[in-house]
């Protein structure tokens, strides 16, 4: 729709990020490709890891082949909640996506507070920290450095750990 494209152009001009969850599977991928072509400098974060448990999810992941698109994994533990911690299916999916677009295009997300009904906040990232399937560098990139680069966050600041109420 022209009004939405106008809004996306304005977001691009103003440096506003677009954080978006698409319809399950590949349904909205062609429309998102149009937005990416029209607004090549609009920073886009595709949410919920492309709805990884639904057929066609990899089409959403492939959007990250564009320089301005990242994939965030908020909700991935919810999507793999049936298998529960340590979410081996989620780890496998992240590795598949990394093979497709590179680990530098993927960002961790908690989907907090929704996930507090099923897991602790620590569990939402601990399954990555404790898996032997990622290198230490991949863990650092996925758990924070990629997001810091994408959103322009200064990682030089040393913040103290604050215990979360759900731990």
Model-derived regions, located:
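Catalytic cores of Mg2+-dependent Asp-rich isoprenoid enzymes
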Residues: 111
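Mid-to-C-terminal alpha-helical segments outside catalytic/metal-binding sites
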Residues: 95-96, 100-107, 116-167
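Catalytic pocket-lining loop regions of alpha/beta-barrel enzymes
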Residues: 1-107, 159-167
């Amino acid at each position: 729709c022209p009004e939405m494209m106008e809004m996306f152009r304005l977001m691009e001009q103003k440096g506003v990020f677009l954080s978006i969850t698409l319809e399950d599977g590949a349904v909205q991928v062609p429309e998102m490709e149009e937005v990416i072509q029209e607004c090549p400098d609009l920073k886009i974060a595709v949410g919920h890891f492309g709805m990884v448990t639904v057929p066609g999810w990899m089409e959403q992941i492939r959007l990250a082949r564009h320089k301005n698109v990242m994939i965030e994994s908020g909700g991935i533990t919810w999507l793999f909640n049936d298998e529960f911690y340590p979410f081996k299916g989620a780890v496998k999916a992240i590795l598949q996506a990394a093979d497709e677009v590179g680990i530098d295009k993927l960002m961790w997300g908690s989907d907090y507070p929704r996930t507090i009904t099923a897991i602790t906040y620590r569990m939402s990232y601990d399954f990555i920290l404790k898996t032997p399937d990622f290198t230490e560098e991949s863990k650092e990139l996925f758990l924070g450095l990629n997001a810091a680069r994408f959103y322009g966050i200064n990682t030089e600041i040393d913040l103290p750990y604050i215990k979360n109420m759900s731990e």
